[in-house]
Amino acid sequence: MAGGTVKYRHLSRNSAARVALLRGLVTQLVQFEHIHTTYAKAKEAQRMAEKLITLAKRDNEPGRRSAQGILYTPTTTLPKLLGELRNRYLTREGGYTRVVRTESKNTYDQGESAILEFVDGPKDSRFMMTAKTVARDRMLGQEHTPVTRTNIKKVTQFRGEVPFEEM
């Protein structure tokens, strides 16, 4: 292939359609805090979402205008981005989103599916899975495995122990 490595996934679309798709995915991510899509689309939207949160954390007019240009419905999603999401990730250096591979959502093509979500949010799947495992271990009277202890440490790092004990 001429030109060296590929810098992004083309997603079988031309440039305008690809940008429109990614803007739509990121807008839905900000609105609902998690989306279910294909793995390739999730990884590309993750890049744009990380940049969007970084723009929101700067809290200046150029960053606000750039974020407004990315989001499709800025009147509803920009206040959430600049308020709730910005405050949630002020102390975090990066890694605001997570891509979790899931079973294929389409039975006819078996394409790779994934969930793109914000970390430390109310719909955080790692937090829910860890809480479920801890509840099962407590009910059975078993010790936590090393993987479970690591996951407990990760999900409570920025969230604190209180929400985990409430589950």
Regions found by a protein language model. Give the residues of each.
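Basic, ligand-binding patches in group-transfer machinery
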Residues: L21
